[in-house]
Amino acid sequence: MGKTTGFMDYTRKTSTDVPPLERMENFDEFHIWLSREEQQTQAARCMDCGVPFCQAGMMIGGMASGCPLNNLIPEWNDLVYHGKWELALHRLLATNRFPEFTSRVCPALCEAACTCGDVTGSSVTVRENEHAIIETGYAKGWLHAAPPPARTGKSVAVVGSGPSGLSVAEYLNKRGHAVTVFERADRVGGLLMYGIPNMKLDKSVIERRIKLMQAEGVEFRTNMDVGGILAAEELLSSYDAVVLCCGAKQARDLNVPGRDANGVHFAVDYLTSVTRSLLDSKFADGRAINAAGRNVLVIGGGDTGNDCQGTALRQGCTDLVALEMMPQPPKERAASNPWPEWPRVLKVDYGQTECLAKFNKDPRIYQTTVKEFLKDDAGNLTGAVISYLKPERDPETGRTRMVPTGEEFTYDCQLAFIAAGFTGCESYVADAFGVDRTPRGNVADQNFKTNVDKVFVCGDMRRGQSVVVWGLREGRDCAAAVDRYLMGYTNL
């Protein structure tokens, strides 16, 4: 595939970024993408390896290795190298209906499993090749509405319009079923719209795709709180199948003194308020939680915590500290973490890069957690007592846990964002439909079907907190299960 000697002839080259201090002046996407000619050269580095782990999507050590969508990566790399962009688009869309999302926000599991990366030390630029393919497709007019040629007469209600909801709706509509998507928020997109900041995924990209889906026959109904203002019974009586795609939105809280202080927020609530205010009024309405002129504490070191860092910096925070409970990862792979496993190494994301540029420091403090939030007489947050932690083996379970060392310090802050992950789906939708739950708080299923007749579940609501690409895979697989239920067979 590609040029036989490409991985030896060419070095890896990726997009550049707008300088940190400059890009923090706005909420725009900041990648400066390669030209199509440069991207063709990068595609030539795909090395015709015997076993393309990049597309395997295997679980190794509890983590994914390679693309969960099983994208045909060597195929479309070869087509890009030869300048056959439209054919590359068709091969990409064969497995991934939303590459404009994954090429922006996916952690690139494919690149971590790239054989070229293992052999040469620098993987093929798979994610950026994917971005070039889909954006070339839009620019050339190759993506246009293609409604199904015939309808099956079956109807499906999809509850939730995040990655899995959009994915299951896309595939079921293409199959010919009448699909209606119900979204609780005022805009379609779920996690994509409000859980990911605009500079990471411009909302016009989502809206462009939604318009295409609408033109193909998918109906979207916003401000529809299923299980709240809209009874579950109404959907069950009106549709041939119902798919629950409500995510894992039950945020993990901190049960510490002072948690009720004004200024302590869940991270997703913060990010949602900022994006909504940006879209509604370009911040003129003053409804966004605002970090301007304030010291900010972020609790949690994942993608959401990083997004909080980047958002607070753009708003003009005066200082920033991010707490991470676990020890700092190594800079290089440990012997116990061999390729093609996902590399458990130190990552520097855009939020940390921007903090370094503005405050000359990495905001992260490892092996720490909040012991207590401090507040004044009016109940406003004034600071937090931070405890240092150390790993300790639990004698009963044998697992390692983090316990306080006894060493503490106080950080003066006026805002704190809890980005400690999620514990499962919100209970009221599951309760409204009467579906069973697992001990981990997810909806229980057998091949995406719940214990309730004609009710299915997919995405984070089924598998727990995950990433966008897994939501898309869940939606694709669930659509096949729903189609089989409705038709007695499936060709999805």
Identify the meaning behind each predicted range.
Residues 13, 18-37, 42-45, 366, ...:
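C-terminal catalytic lobe of FAD-dependent flavoproteins
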Residues 151-164, 291-302:
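Beta1/beta-strand and adjacent pyrophosphate-binding region of the FAD-binding site
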Residues 305-310, 461-489:
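A conserved FAD-binding loop/helix module that cradles the flavin
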Residues 150, 155-159, 207-256, 371-385, ...:
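Feature captures the FAD/FMN-dependent oxidoreductase FAD-binding
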Residues 260-293, 392-465:
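FAD-site-proximal beta/loop scaffold in flavoenzymes
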Residues 152-155, 223, 292-295, 367, ...:
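Phosphate-coordination loops involved in phosphoryl transfer and adenosine-cofactor binding
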Residues 40, 44, 48-56, 62-149, ...:
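Glycine/serine-rich phosphate-binding loop and adjoining beta1-alpha1 elements at the start
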Residues 8-32, 41-44, 70-80, 91-92, ...:
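Beta1-alpha1 glycine-rich phosphate/pyrophosphate-binding loop at the start
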